[in-house]
Amino acid sequence: MADLSLDFCGVKFKNPVVVASLETTNSPEVIRECVDAGAGGMIIKTLTDIEDMARLTQNSKYAILNEKNELIRGKVNKNFVFYSRSGYSSTPLREWIPHLKDLNKYAQDQGSHLIGSAGGKTVQSWIDICRTIEDCGLPMVELNFGCPHPAMMPGVHGGSMIGQEPDIAREVTARVCEAVKIPVVIKLTPDQSRVLDVARAVKEAGAAGVTATNRYTGFSVDIETGLPRLGGPAGIGGVWAKALSLRWVNRIYTELGMPITGSNGIYDHKDVVEFIMTGAPLVQVGSVLMLKGIKYLPSIINGLDSFMDIHGYPDIASMTGIASRQAVKDYGEQFRKPRMHSEITSEACKNPSCTICIQTCFYDALAQGDGSVESIHANCIGCEMCTQTCPFDATAMHTTTDEQRALQEFFMIKEEVFENKKFEKGFERGIKLAKVKG
């Protein structure tokens, strides 16, 4: 059996699946339910002194959409769109204090952790909230620099408004890190192009790690009524956003090398694996639990355990970042990889007259032959589109040899270049020889 435990910023987690800061952590009762379901941790819904952000949660609105841009009506598919408007914890901080110590003990007795989340009105209130969290014994705090809603709240400056400004994010982070001893993790907003700059700024300011990422701000329309859903802009996320979240996990892991929790894009254990392999050993699960209930949580944890056993991963560390470490650093590396071309297996092509592969090849590399589809190697650029549009799995990619590729690029190469096997050292050297001798 795989070891799901891990150390994240000095805190030991029994498994990497943490319940994100949202409605599922907005009450002591549901937090206990998360503990009982086996969560590695729970991040409390953001504690705040911003009254309007607490009031917003008391007036939350949701529009959960399917692939047809219609309300799901009880049918939760994997690619749902979670469009909603909600704020910070609807319970005042002073009312949370009596519960935090008890909940933290309840969690730790079962090998789990209650993690704080803060969203202040001023720098001093950020400090005060985090000190309260620390005084209650919580082992870690997340600063919510990612919430998309403050930008739509007149007079409110917080959430993504801080997370979009590296200098402000650095200042708040530094002040909080000076004030508390527990690890401080920053939740980043994807509503910008400077995510890496902000991550670098908070790292320099003392942050122990980052969460990549919160949700986006979106706009959705009901075309039957012509009205904006929920009346206008709202937060938007879901599994469809996973690749966007992973982009930032990849860059932060590769370029900054700091601890990351992954968020925004998890439905099942396979998504958890993607985040871990990209570089986020700890993951936050949120919207799917709101749609399927806390009882769904064990299936994610058990699925991860089974996956690791089947694929031979002994622990979380053995998976962490393996995809990012093998990723190209820039698109130029793609040009140095072996050239590929498609081949059609006529026996597998059950209906050559369907021609979908030909219709979706925009390089004239496929053509209708005598009762079959023919591949024209000289035109094929190796994009692999045909392997995905063919309904019969009749196409496959093959490596184009250096000689074949050189012949495609240089039409007047003298034969003696090939006679001495001058291309054995690789394509780039072969091309140089072809240029000289051609």
Q: What are these regions, as identified by a protein language model?
A:
Residues 1-127:
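N-terminal capping/small domains of soluble enzymes
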Residues 32-37, 41, 109-110, 121-261, ...:
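Alpha/beta enzyme core
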Residues 45-47, 145, 214, 287-288:
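Short secondary-structure boundary segments
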Residues 51-71, 219-237, 288-313, 407-414:
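C-terminal helical cap(s) of enzyme catalytic domains, especially alpha/beta-barrels
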Residues 250-256, 271-327, 381, 385-388:
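Extended, hydrophobic interaction surfaces within ordered domains
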Residues 304-314, 318-334, 346-347, 351, ...:
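Flanking helices and flexible, charged tails adjoining ferredoxin-like Fe-S electron-transfer domains
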Residues 338-370:
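C-terminal accessory/binding modules appended to enzymatic or scaffolding proteins
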Residues 369-377:
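Short linker/helix segments within small regulatory modules
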